[in-house]
């Protein structure tokens, strides 16, 4: 298993009724996830609504989770930015706070060319002695990092892994541990000998996804049984469905900050059906 773990949950950021970061809720959720299948947590990533957190909030969430888990599970801090100086700043601060690794997305919106991408990651790598996990998600960033570019980035000393959310690039790259960036890619990544996944559905079916790692002979059967959950988590923009699911299950993670909005009735029904099909709502209300 990777030093970061196999099942890494991309944790939501709980908010209170005024959409302030719920610090107690953050700690509770972190403990719940680690108790239910997660080897580690990725905080302040896409699912954690990092783009609508202030830097103070962002770093506070990292601080809370690192302090709470205290070596019981790994903490990967999402610190990516399309501003290299800002990414360096967040990297330095997250390193000081004790994060085990740093997740860095491809710079988005300004869409740098290949040389710019390499320079960006060279600069952030200089800012830490911790492992860096690259994050390739062209559907959000507008830029794909093909495997030959990933191989070049792997030459940077502390660039050690990639969260791959482009299924067309799903192949091992020398020098990089491979993590599934989508729930429905986990089985394929594990079959390829990859490290695991950075996942959303593990908020609600973490123990089942853990079994996909521990029981390779049953992996495909388990994966097939979870397709409705994966689909529900993608019923609309992440993290809208997973926050809806957690609230239905009694975890009280609150709403979302604009421009994201809460699930509508149709989306909520999809999420509810998936939870009910696995007996999760019955368990939560028992």
PLM region descriptions:
Residues 15-16, 186, 266:
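Short, acidic Gly/Pro/Ser/Thr-rich loop/turn segments
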Residues 53-56, 89, 114-117, 145-147, ...:
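Short secondary-structure transition/capping segments
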